[in-house]
UniProtKB/Swiss-Prot annotation:
Pathway: Phospholipid metabolism; phosphatidylinositol metabolism
Alphabetical UniProt keywords: Glycosyltransferase, Lipid biosynthesis, Lipid metabolism, Phospholipid biosynthesis, Phospholipid metabolism, Transferase
Record keyword Lipid metabolism present: yes
One Pfam family it belongs to: Glycos_transf_1
Function of the protein: Catalyzes the addition of a mannose residue from GDP-D-mannose to GlcAGroAc2 to generate 1,2-di-O-C16/C18:1-(alpha-D-mannopyranosyl)-(1-4)-(alpha-D-glucopyranosyluronic acid)-(1-3)-glycerol(ManGlcAGroAc2).
Organism: Corynebacterium glutamicum (strain ATCC 13032 / DSM 20300 / JCM 1318 / BCRC 11384 / CCUG 27702 / LMG 3730 / NBRC 12168 / NCIMB 10025 / NRRL B-2784 / 534)
EC number: 2.4.1.-
GO biological process annotation, one example: phospholipid biosynthetic process
The protein's name: GDP-mannose-dependent alpha-mannosyltransferase
One GO MF term attached to the UniProt entry: mannosyltransferase activity
Family: Belongs to the glycosyltransferase group 1 family.
Highest taxon listed in the record's lineage: Bacteria
A Gene Ontology term for the protein's cellular component: membrane
Amino acid sequence: MEIIRPMRVAIVAESFLPNVNGVTNSVLRVLEHLKANGHDALVIAPGARDFEEEIGHYLGFEIVRVPTVRVPLIDSLPIGVPLPSVTSVLREYNPDIIHLASPFVLGGAAAFAARQLRIPAIAIYQTDVAGFSQRYHLAPLATASWEWIKTVHNMCQRTLAPSSMSIDELRDHGINDIFHWARGVDSKRFHPGKRSVALRKSWDPSGAKKIVGFVGRLASEKGVECLAGLSGRSDIQLVIVGDGPEAKYLQEMMPDAIFTGALGGEELATTYASLDLFVHPGEFETFCQAIQEAQASGVPTIGPRAGGPIDLINEGVNGLLLDVVDFKETLPAAAEWILDDSRHSEMCAAAWEGVKDKTWEALCTQLLQHYADVIALSQRIPLTFFGPSAEVAKLPLWVARALGVRTRISIEA
C-alpha cells in the first residue's frame, strides 16, 4: 500500500455538529481517521441555531463557523451563508486539498474559492437536493438544482458518490470524473450482541409481537407515513426512532407506535439490535446509512427500489426492495414474509455477514488515497484560474445574480 505523506485537509461541510445526520456523521469519521493517521484538518461549517451549543474544535481541529439561515419547510436544517471570509480562511490555512461534504450553498462558495486559490478539491455527493425539491412541492427548483450541482461538482477534480444509482444520476446530469466511495459502519458499536431482552419487554410486555422499527429524521422526504400499514396490528409493535417536523403528525397517524425521540451512542445501538425488522421508505437516500447500521446489528431490512438501498439490500437474502409507488400497500406482506420463522434467522445472519467488513477504517483509507491521487494530478497538471463569469453565465438567473456578487467580493477578500 502506498505511504501517504501528512496532509492539510480543509473540510467544508454543508452540515455539522450540533446537527446530527448522514453528512455530519461521515465528516466526523473522516476527521477521526485524519487525526489517527497524523494529518491536519480545518472545518468550515454552518453555525448552530440560537438554542444549540456550538463547539469550536473537534479532536483539536478548528471549526470555523459561518452564519446560518433557516429555510421554510426544512427549518430544522440550518443553511450556512457563504460569506467572502470563506476564501480568506482557505487562503490562510493553505490546505493541500479541499473536501466538500455534500456541497450546495456553502460548499458551492468553497468550490469557487478552491479554483480561485488553485487548490484541488474533491466533492462528496450525499444529498439528493433535486429530489427533496420535488418532495416539498418545489418541482421548478429541481432543474435549477441540477444545473447548480453540475457547476459545483465540475469545478472539482473528482466527485465521490456513494451508490451505483447516484453515479448514474450524476452522469446523466453531466457531472464528470465520478468515483464510487461508499460509507463505513462501526461493526463493533452496531452488533447483534447488543440485542436487549429487557428493552424488547419494555416495548412489548407480552413478548408475543415482532418489533419493526425505523431510525431517521421524521421529515417528509423519509416517507415514514408508509409504516402506518403496520400500525394497529396485534402481532407487530412499531418503534420509531428520531425527531423532526413531522413527529406530531406521525404520532397522530400511528398512535400505538412507540416514539423514542432521537437516540445516539449505545442507546441507539441497543435499539437497532433489539428490532426484528428495519424499514426505511425514503426514496431520496443517496446511500442510507441507517439501513447499513441495522444490517450490522443483524436485522433484515426493507427499503425502496430507489437510491442507495438498491446496493445495500440483496433481495431475498438480507431483506426486500419495494417499488416506491406502492410501498405502503406492499409493506405488510413483505414484512410478514421476512418475519416468518422459517427464514428470519437466516436473513438476520446474512444481514450481519454482508456488512461486518465494511469498516470506516477501510473506507477512510480509500478516501485518503483519493486525496493523494488528486493532489498528485494537480501537481502534474496545474489548475487554471477559473474566473466567475465563465460559470455564472450557465446558471439560472436567480443563482447567477447572487453568485456573481459574492464571487467578485471573495476574489478581493
